[in-house]
Design a protein with these regions (language model features):
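Exported/periplasmic ABC-transporter solute-binding proteins
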Residues: 1-186
Length: 186
């Protein structure tokens, strides 16, 4: 069963409202301002259509920039990084390519740090991270944009008597400060 955290259930509405706090951002990042095909694809991601793809795949949208109109950019771009962002990015690429058939988008799955490093080094056009960017990454010239939020439900066995815990309790469990349910219940 999923626990309430600080009195809030793990729902899309509560994550959007900020009352359920256990969530992480799905970020994309570019070195400087995106241009051409990369910019057009990012515009798609942040459009009504792109944010619908995000919601249809179980993530929390970030609002949109309105309806999408492609600028007709062609060529090839590389999107690289987080294995957590990859499944929804695959769906975004598929939907975008249905609109812009002349776009070639290569998706490289790795991890957030590798994606951000590739974007800083110019070996990919768009990096993906399932976390906030580190200071060193923004200082390295990356501009990030949150495309979705990923809520993380805290789940316990159905026989566990707990129905709720505080965000401090969750932190204590994952940092090892507490190791038994008796310690959490205090």
């Amino acid at each position: 069963k999923a626990l309430k955290i600080d009195g809030a259930e793990a729902t899309a509405e509560n994550i959007k409202a900020g009352t359920y706090k256990i969530a992480r951002p799905f970020n994309i990042a570019t070195k400087g301002d995106a241009t051409g095909l990369a910019a057009d694809f990012i515009n798609y991601i942040m459009s009504d259509e792109g944010q619908k793809v995000i919601e249809d795949n179980g993530y929390i949208s970030q609002g949109s920039n309105g309806a999408f109109t492609s600028d007709g950019s062609t060529g090839k771009i590389v999107v690289a990084g987080s294995s957590s962002v990859t499944p929804v990015m695959e769906k975004l690429i598929e939907a975008y390519k249905a609109i812009n058939k002349d776009a070639e988008i290569e998706l490289q799955e790795s991890d957030s740090t590798t994606g951000m490093t590739a974007a800083m080094e110019g070996t990919c056009d768009i990096g993906m991270a399932s976390r906030e960017l580190k200071d060193s990454e923004t200082e390295g010239g990356l501009t990030a944009q949150v495309i979705a939020m990923d809520g993380i439900a805290v789940v316990v066995n159905n026989s566990n008597p707990m129905d709720e815990m505080s965000s401090d309790n969750v932190k204590d469990i994952f940092t090892g400060a507490v190791t038994t349910w008796d310690e959490v219940a205090k």
